[in-house]
Amino acid sequence: MERIRLKLKAYDHRVLDRTVAAIVEAVKRTGADIRGPIPMPTKIKRYTVLKSPHINKDSREQFEIRIHARMLDIVAATPDTVDSLTKLDLAPEVSVEVRAMGK
């Protein structure tokens, strides 16, 4: 058939790794070849806010959120592979982007 690229993102890397392991197991059961998981760079978003509502600009608090990402390439995907991926129950915390690529 064709190649399928999956990009997965989550705030918690443990949930992300469990989801990736479930996808890899489901794809290997169908007999398709898989490349990855490839760990992508972690994106860190930092936010700085004032502690006081009015004055005292020297007193600030910093927060950060980390976005972990993994990428999987499924080579020579069959209709069984696509069917098993659609039936897979994934964690709601994980964002999955699916892109079908040419041969």
Curated annotation (Swiss-Prot):
NCBIfam families: PRK00596.1, rpsJ_bact
Protein name as catalogued: Small ribosomal subunit protein uS10
Entry GO terms, CC: ribonucleoprotein complex; ribosome
Family to which the UniProt record says this protein belongs: Belongs to the universal ribosomal protein uS10 family.
Assembly information from the UniProt record: Part of the 30S ribosomal subunit.
Entries under SMART domains matching the protein: Ribosomal_S10
Name of the gene: rpsJ
Role description: Involved in the binding of tRNA to the ribosomes.
Keyword annotations of the record: Ribonucleoprotein, Ribosomal protein
Matching InterPro entries: Ribosomal_uS10, Ribosomal_uS10_CS, Ribosomal_uS10_dom, Ribosomal_uS10_dom_sf
Gene3D superfamilies assigned: Ribosomal protein S10 domain
Example GO BP: translation
Record organism: Campylobacter jejuni subsp. jejuni serotype O:2 (strain ATCC 700819 / NCTC 11168)
Keyword Ribosomal protein: yes
A Gene Ontology molecular function term of the record: structural constituent of ribosome
Pfam families: Ribosomal_S10
